[in-house]
Amino acid sequence: MGAFTQHVLSEGWSFKDSGDQSPDAWLSVPTVPSVVHQDLQANGKLDDPFIGLNELSARWVNEKSWTYRNVFQKPTVPAGSSIFLVFDGLDTFAKVKLDGQVILESDNMFLAHRVDITKALDVEGEHTLEIDFDCALLRARELRKQHPDHKWVGFNGDTARLSVRKAQYHWGWDWGPVLMTAGIWKEVRLEVYSAKISDLWTEVHLAEDHSKARITAAAEVETQGTGNSYKATFTLSLQGQQIGKEVATLDGNVAKTTFDVQEPSLWWPNGYGDQTLYEISVSLEKEEEQAHQVSKKFGIRTAEVIQRPDKHGKSFFFRINGVDIFCGGACWIPADSLLTNITPDRYRKWIELMAVGHQVMIRVWGGGIYEDESFYQACDEVGVMVWQDFMFGCGNYPTWPEILESIEKEAEYNLRRLRHHPSIVIWVGNNEDYQVQEQQGLTYNYADKDPESWLKTDFPARYIYEHLLPKAVQKIIPSAYYHPGSPWGDGKITSDPTVGDMHQWNVWHGTQEKYQIFDTLGGRFNSEFGMEAFPHMSTIDHFVTNEADKYPQSHVLDFHNKADGHERRIATYLVENLRTATDLEVYIYLTQVVQAETMMFGYRGWRRQWGDERHCGGALLWQLNDCWPTISWAIVDYFLRPKPAFYAVSRVLKPLAIGVRREHHDWSVSHAQPPKTSKYELWVVSSLLKEVIGKVELRFISIKTGLAIHESIVRENVTIVPNGTTNILDGVIDHAVDEPHVLAARLWVDGELVARDVDWPQPFKYLDLSDRGLEITRISKTESEQVLELSARKPVKCLVFEERDNVRVSDSAIDIVPGDEQFVTIKGLKRSDAPLKYKFLGQ
């Protein structure tokens, strides 16, 4: 019996334009996995498509077919063993040839493939592996032409993309370039074995009181002969300590056993408890010899989506281990247009940044990819819950038999691959495809429950979302929650705020409402909303190489903003709210102020609504990240540099947060007449699971003088309810008497100042914010850490620190009021480094 061995084929590859027959056409590939754009860049054949207008000069790559080749030695194959060629992912139309013979054809980027090549490698010595990648751009157009009866409609990119199981954003999106990659985008290897564990999974049943858990462990086994002489030894461990061991025989090709765990340690989202991960290991043995061994980590937890009738309609919120959790977080797009650029370390940094920002959920958006294992592993370990879309986005997908078969395989493969991750708490059928159905007037009769009839309508994709995918989820992960689409709610119009989840784009897109009323526009769960902002100057310096192009409306900057109508939308929100500027650095800052304020108004109000019978169950901003250096809705740019909005969201999502706001007065529709009076409200939100006693203070500070215009209001011994909202007080501002002033709120618990909020008169453009008397004093310094004290004579709006690589500030986008010194810790800034630059409104 030969034990399992594998040989990764990462070196020795070459590639060429498939149509180039010249002898010097072959170019070297530095390493695999890779995609063709990287390999062309490595050979000096392509300029970086992320710089300037280079995306345009890279378009020729999109229209070519490519061939990759590797000459390898046949590995040693013990008697009774077979040899398999394994691809974890091929992008996308791939024909694989071994020594000139076709052994595999693939047309789905999201599938892995295994080919038994034992007979093909009968001859010892060298063998030639060749992969032809046909042009996906042209193949998609051919497929669309072959199916004229289908209604090819959608948002973003060429609608021919709907015919191909490839990352949809490769066709371009309203935040990303058109870069049609091709290549071996995941690992390729040779596996030699007589027996192999092909799958290992667990099913966890947790007692309602959490006193015990029953874990069923199962392993699927593949053998090259009779399998009944093998046994499987399962081991359950926690933090390296074995807590259970069981031996099972094979029943067919599956071995199963159970473990009972008393007083189990549970997996929790960050901020609610530990992210405990157990390890299940299985060893496949025959006659005391080990043939193969596999381990996976998993968590013990329950995850529910609570949808029940209430006074607001029908709830939509998450309950983990019996605890209701407000899901503040963000949507995730692929972190690079060239996917093989992304390292496990980069994934880890993204997820750790979310936890630093008090975010507990990330939504893997349906126009990208089922993410890499290291992404989900980071989410498991850091405690970020995953909302997982299936890979369908913004379109009316076709359903001819071959593509349905491919989609079913794709769904089952990725469900199996990812089912052990406790962070994944929901599977969702698509992104905005029901909105395409609504806007295009496609047939959707929710009362019709016959899946076969859906295939005959002009919206056949319903069959995928309401039949094929839920069936696959039920088959592979029976305990998982499935939701047909995002947004979607019981078959009602997707903008219905009373049910399901909602994408609220009437700030920025749509009716372009004032961001100050964002919280009034939400629904039961706000799974998309956003506001664009420029990235920091250091990021713009990276892709704008000509100094003459560094002005706000330059061609290069417009080219790197893919959102339709971005000029007028950015201009609208700037002109409505701020004194505008043409200097690029100031302009960047102003767009960032607008984004930070927009996110704050949305999250602050929606989190408050959580305490009103779970009126709002969560808010996932669009978007966390970028796939290239660009101007977009991201709150952290391509280089992991947070924009001010990141810090604004972080403060609002702290375990304890205080909120104060005056009622909105729409100056644009009242001839800019000021209101005579304004009501204001003060409240505290808590995600803590126990009641706490706090002290609350509200001050009224003149913007002009920095002096108090009224006595402070102080409430001692305030009982703050757990996991909800505590309304503290309300009042009225008399504008005939009171000069323009801020409402400055603070919260103390056990003598510690834990939260602040400052409400300002709107809009900022009417305020004189000069001569603020800001002082920034360094009060402590070590080789790698500095603490700054911030104070001001008059209220300061949105103090933003420069973002430098490998330097982290504990807070930014800060409002400062007199008599309330704040402290910011800077890590990674050395003694010899120049101090961080900063900006504030009116500077």
Curated annotation (Swiss-Prot):
Metabolic or biological pathway, per its Swiss-Prot or TrEMBL entry: Glycan metabolism; N-glycan degradation
Temperature dependence comment: Optimum temperature is 37 degrees Celsius (at pH 6).
GO MF entries: beta-mannosidase activity
Annotated active site: 432
More details: In contrast to clade A beta-mannosidases, which are likely secreted, clade B proteins appear to be intracellular.
Family assignment from sequence similarity: Belongs to the glycosyl hydrolase 2 family. Beta-mannosidase B subfamily.
Function text: Exoglycosidase that cleaves the single beta-linked mannose residue from the non-reducing end of beta-mannosidic oligosaccharides of various complexity and length. Prefers mannobiose over mannotriose and has no activity against polymeric mannan. Is also severely restricted by galactosyl substitutions at the +1 subsite. Releases the terminal mannose residue from mannobiose, mannotriose and galactosyl-mannotriose (GM3), but not from galactosyl-mannobiose (GM2) or di-galactosyl-mannopentaose (G2M5).
PANTHER family: BETA-MANNOSIDASE (PTHR43730:SF1)
UniProt protein name: Beta-mannosidase B
Organism of origin: Emericella nidulans (strain FGSC A4 / ATCC 38163 / CBS 112.46 / NRRL 194 / M139)
Lineage: Eukaryota, Fungi, Dikarya, Ascomycota, Pezizomycotina
